[in-house]
UniProtKB/Swiss-Prot annotation:
Annotated binding of [4Fe-4S] cluster, by residue: C81, C87, C90, C162
GO molecular function, one term: RNA binding
PROSITE patterns: SAM_MT_RNA_M5U (PS51687), TRAM (PS50926), TRMA_1 (PS01230), TRMA_2 (PS01231)
Naturally occurring in which organism (per UniProt): Klebsiella pneumoniae subsp. pneumoniae (strain ATCC 700721 / MGH 78578)
Superkingdom, taxonomy of origin: Bacteria
Protein name: 23S rRNA (uracil(1939)-C(5))-methyltransferase RlmD
List of catalytic residues: C389 (nucleophile)
HAMAP family: 23SrRNA_methyltr_RlmD
Keyword field contains Transferase: yes
Record-level GO BP terms: rRNA base methylation
UniProt xrefs under PANTHER family: 23S RRNA (URACIL(1939)-C(5))-METHYLTRANSFERASE RLMD, RNA M5U METHYLTRANSFERASE
Binding site for S-adenosyl-L-methionine: Q265, F294, N299, E315, N342, D363
Reactions this protein catalyses: uridine(1939) in 23S rRNA + S-adenosyl-L-methionine = 5-methyluridine(1939) in 23S rRNA + S-adenosyl-L-homocysteine + H(+)
EC number: 2.1.1.190
């Protein structure tokens, strides 16, 4: 979700003031009022009073840092992670989960000018099945740093635990660090990516120089000992599969094989609920033709095909289109057609646009889908489900449907990333009958 402030920074005197926070924004910042404008203060919750130092003063808003908290909210909780406040991964571990969801729900409602009907959430801890950890060898200490970037900085926070990771990946962290620290090429390691597939964990190691045979042997032994699939990435475009079987996950009971480079939702529990909700909202009938835009490798497309007459998936990444086709065949689905097309170009010239559809689902990236919204109107589907990772572009694109006579029937906030400022959502639009 983007913030809309762009005025030039104004010099402050680092004045110390006492404020009472009355709201929490979706990013976990406390919101107070000072001299008639919003004052954002990280680390302070609604109804808490604090002494703060003004550090930024703009025409429409100001920012401050906490000097001393004077009162505590009953919604305050002790952060579970020892790295919270330094690591840039989480911003809201100090706030209760109900408060986090309430603030995100309120922000979504304000943008959409409508009450939020549902909050779709899963486990608040141990939910993340994918993580990329930066690696950096420190010559002075002769130690390998492994962790996440600091908030608003490039420095690496060495992590020994991460409670938002699924337990299988969190348990691997010490062993991965020990293994990588024992490599002779540890000065040439870029990052390590860990993914928990349904058939076990996998590790991708990015290295910037060739690994000697002894290092490759150590890594292969490590992957065998810990039952994980191993991939090496000597270049960003190259992926070498060293050990283990291809990873897969399930979506509505279907098995989707993926490459470590492919996009998958990091929160499996919420993803499963999201897919089921989309299927329910679309109210699919056996005779329906369904269009799935920005379909990826078929996270929605394939489950849709188990309930509809025919499904068309459109995606801009060639590798994902190929994976979608392979997974359709693997699951015995012959009523699916995938198209590789750039949906930011003139879609009216694309082959899929010549077909008619009864229902449409779209799941675009943060930029939204301004280029395809007019064509969706021309298709005149009875129902449209829009899944969004950016409520600002969702609100913009929704106006196109609303002005064309569609109505919002359901609005849900997806708590895909607890303890962070990320806000995802999904909306059901239905065409008004004339």
């Amino acid at each position: 979700m983007a913030q809309f402030y762009s005025a030039k920074r104004r010099v402050t005197t680092r004045q110390i003031i006492t404020v009472t926070v009355n709201d929490l924004d979706p990013f976990g910042q406390g919101v107070a009022r000072h001299q008639g404008k919003a004052l954002f203060v990280s680390g302070v919750l609604p109804h808490e009073q604090a002494e703060v130092v003004l550090v930024e003063d703009k025409k429409q808003y100001a920012r401050a840092e906490v000097k001393r908290r004077l009162t505590d909210s009953p919604q305050r909780q002790a952060p579970r992670c020892p790295h919270f406040g330094v690591c840039g991964g989480c911003q809201q571990q100090h706030a209760s989960v109900p408060l986090q969801q309430q603030s995100k729900r309120a922000a979504l409602g304000r943008l959409m000018k409508r009450e939020v009907d549902d909050v779709i959430a899963g486990a608040p801890w141990g939910y993340r099945r994918r993580a990329r950890l930066s690696l950096n060898y420190q010559p002075k200490t002769q130690q390998l740093q492994m962790g996440f970037r600091q908030a608003n900085a490039k420095a690496i926070v060495d992590v020994v635990q991460c409670p938002v990771l699924v337990p299988q990946l969190e348990a691997l962290l010490p062993a991965v660090r020990e293994c990588l620290s024992a490599l002779s090429a540890l000065r040439h390691l870029g990052h390590v990516e860990l993914v928990q597939a349904d058939n076990g964990p996998l590790m991708v190691l990015r290295h910037t120089a060739a690994l000697p045979a002894t290092d490759r042997e150590k890594l292969e032994r490590f992957s065998q000992t810990h039952g994980l699939s191993l991939y090496l990435a000597p270049q960003s475009e190259i992926l070498e599969h060293i050990h283990g079987e291809a990873p897969w996950y399930t979506s509505d009971g279907l098995r989707l094989v993926f490459s470590p480079r492919d996009f998958i939702q990091v929160n499996d529990g919420v993803n499963q609920q999201m897919v089921r909700t989309a299927l329910e909202w679309l109210d699919l009938r056996p005779e329906d033709r369904v269009l799935d835009l920005f379909c990826g490798m078929g996270n929605f497309t394939l489950p849709l095909a188990t309930r509809a007459a025919h499904v068309v998936g459109v995606e801009g990444v060639p590798a994902l289109v190929e994976k979608g086709r392979e997974n359709a065949a693997r699951n015995g689905l012959s009523n699916v057609t995938f198209f590789h097309e750039n949906l930011e170009e003139d879609v009216t010239r694309q082959a899929w646009a010549k077909h008619g559809f009864d229902k449409v689902l779209l799941d675009p990236a943060r930029a939204g889908a301004p280029g395809v919204m007019p064509h969706i109107i021309k298709l005149a589907p009875r129902r449209v489900v829009y899944v969004s990772c950016n409520p600002a572009t969702l609100a913009r694109d929704s106006e196109t449907l609303l002005q064309a006579g569609y109505q919002i029937q359901r609005l849900a906030m997806l708590d895909m990333f607890p303890h962070t400022g990320h806000l995802e959502s999904m909306v059901l639009f239905e065409r008004r009958l004339t």
